[in-house]
């Protein structure tokens, strides 16, 4: 259910400015999106797992806050990130 180091490194290289750029907003949003997608697959099988659902809602909220921050700071990076991750506005 959690991401392994290879998956994280791939996301950091794809969305970050360098291989060690784990703190940028774009990388954080991309990592949260991967974790959210993994949890959505988990809920297809475990519909009554309410404890994990709370964590999912927390991650979605955190991603929304980061996206709002990015939208205020740099609209072009925001639109590029939304398109590359396949998210709605």
UniProtKB/Swiss-Prot annotation:
Keywords (A to Z) from UniProt: Ribonucleoprotein, Ribosomal protein, RNA-binding, rRNA-binding
Keyword Ribonucleoprotein in record: yes
Organism: Hamiltonella defensa subsp. Acyrthosiphon pisum (strain 5AT)
Similarity field: Belongs to the universal ribosomal protein uS15 family.
Listed InterPro entries: Ribosomal_uS15, Ribosomal_uS15_bac-type, uS15_NS1_RNA-bd_sf
Protein name: Small ribosomal subunit protein uS15
GO-annotated molecular function: rRNA binding; structural constituent of ribosome
Quaternary context: Part of the 30S ribosomal subunit. Forms a bridge to the 50S subunit in the 70S ribosome, contacting the 23S rRNA.
GO annotation terms (biological process): translation
Pfam family, one: Ribosomal_S15
Function: One of the primary rRNA binding proteins, it binds directly to 16S rRNA where it helps nucleate assembly of the platform of the 30S subunit by binding and bridging several RNA helices of the 16S rRNA.
Entry GO CC: cytosolic small ribosomal subunit
